[in-house]
Structure formats: structure tokens, C-alpha cells
Design a protein with these regions (language model features):
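Non-heme Fe(II)/2-oxoglutarate
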Residues: 1-87
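Catalytic core of non-heme Fe(II) oxygenases with the double-stranded beta-helix
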Residues: 81-159
């Protein structure tokens, strides 16, 4: 048997969230009291990495996750089955990373998740972009913007 790697086209969704100010306020407030996890065995080398299922009952975050999930459902229609039905997406994990100068994320993917997303809470135009390793496409971070993508897509951020 032979395994052959191929590059393929994959769509990503980039959009703005109308309640970005509320999300920013909530995130910045909660980061002050969060319990960061160790990054020893992680691809993410950020100044802060919250726990994997951060604030699951927070209504502001639940609304953000629901909105992005609905946008993925609308534009990508994942989970389609041959009989015409669909399995709806679920948001399994939700965490925050704080990247300071010199921080980065090594190339990684979010398999086995069908989709994943990044949401930029606080950003400047010169911050490191979210880079898709297969295509080389880079997304410049902008406050209040999300980027949703298939979980198998390789992503990274370079140190700034």
C-alpha cells in the first residue's frame, strides 16, 4: 500500500461578530482570574492558555459559539447524509490563548473535530497572522473577527 499526500481546496469562513465589545469585556475580565494550564505538551506556546473547556456556562461565550456554529452550518453545510438528513455540529472545546511578543503556535490541526475556529478578541494590524500551513494563506487578525475552518487544516502562528 502507498499513501499519497495531496493538497486540496478547502473553504474557510471569516466574519465579524456584532457583539464583539461584550465578548472582549468578558474575556479580559475572566482572564484576570483564570487558571492557566501547562503548555509543556502543547503546540501552543502562548503567555496564557486557559483550560480546554473554558467557562462552559458563560452566556456571552455560548452565544458567540452558537453564532459561529450557525455560520458554519449555513455556508458549509457539514454533516450532510445520503438520505438528506444532517448531523448538526457541536462545539466541544472552547479556550483562550494570549499571545505576547515572542509567543507562537507550532503547526497543528484540530482533528478529529469537523470544524474549528479562531476568534480575535484583542488585536493590532501588526500582530502575527493565523497561517494555514497547507496553502500558505494568512489571515491578519482583526478585533471582533472569527475564522472558521475544517479541523483537518494545519494552522500556526509565528512569533512576533
Amino acid at each position: 500500500m502507498e499513501v499519497i499526500s495531496v493538497k486540496h481546496k478547502a473553504d474557510i469562513i471569516k466574519g465579524e461578530y456584532q457583539f464583539a465589545d461584550k465578548v472582549k469585556s468578558e474575556v479580559l475580565s475572566l482572564l484576570k482570574v483564570c487558571n492557566p494550564i501547562s503548555q509543556d505538551n502543547s503546540n501552543v506556546k502562548a503567555s496564557i492558555h486557559t483550560e480546554w473547556d473554558w467557562e462552559p456556562d458563560n452566556i456571552t461565550f455560548r452565544n458567540l459559539k452558537s453564532y459561529i456554529r450557525e455560520e458554519i452550518e449555513r455556508y458549509c453545510k457539514p454533516g450532510a447524509m445520503s438520505g438528506g438528513g444532517r448531523n448538526m455540529l457541536k462545539v466541544g472545546n472552547f479556550w483562550a490563548n494570549v499571545y505576547n511578543k515572542g509567543d507562537y503556535a507550532q503547526s497543528h490541526c484540530h482533528k478529529p473535530n469537523d470544524f474549528s475556529f479562531a476568534y480575535f478578541v484583542k488585536s493590532k494590524w501588526y500582530y502575527s497572522p493565523l497561517a494555514f500551513t497547507d496553502s500558505g494563506k494568512k489571515i491578519i487578525p482583526k478585533e471582533g473577527t472569527f475564522v472558521a475552518f475544517p479541523g483537518y487544516q494545519g494552522i500556526c502562528t509565528h512569533s512576533s
